[in-house]
Amino acid sequence: MANISQKYAQALYDVAEEQNLTDDILNELDQITISVKGLLREVRAIDNNPKLAKNERQQFVENVFKGVSKPLLNTLFLLANNSKLSLIPEIDGDYRKIYNQVHSQDLMKVESVYPLSNEELDEIGKAFIKRTGLKKLILENQVNDSLIGGIRVSIGTKVYDGSIQNDLNQLTKSFQQMK
């Protein structure tokens, strides 16, 4: 399914870029995804209902998603007609990946034992901007008591682990290899 959602996301991004709506659609798609995630079972039921005619599916989209930009609405019509509305969360994720790549930015999750201040997050962000070469990092702090101390940073698929828990794990492995 990932390839299908990537194709929809890329097509939507291309149209959004032509119309200078990439930011607007990113925000609209995020809002729609939040709504759809809570109703995924119902959305799948709509996708899997062979008795729903195309005009009924389009009417559903018009009623539920009114007010969204034209390119996004057309994509939602296409998803409804192809019984793929349940792919909205995946399309949102793929659209965000494309958006982040084009804008040379990414999400940076910083795990710490306690909530970090904005100043601390900014300093960590600046260090990782230099390290990664990205123009911007979207910072998110998550509290993780199991780290004992230090931080663990995730950017995309890369993890930078500077936690005491990781140091202890590495030390344990070293001792086990000595046996």
Can you name each region flagged by the protein language model?
Residues 1-179:
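Elongated, mostly alpha-helical coiled-coil "stalk/stator" tethers of large membrane protein machines
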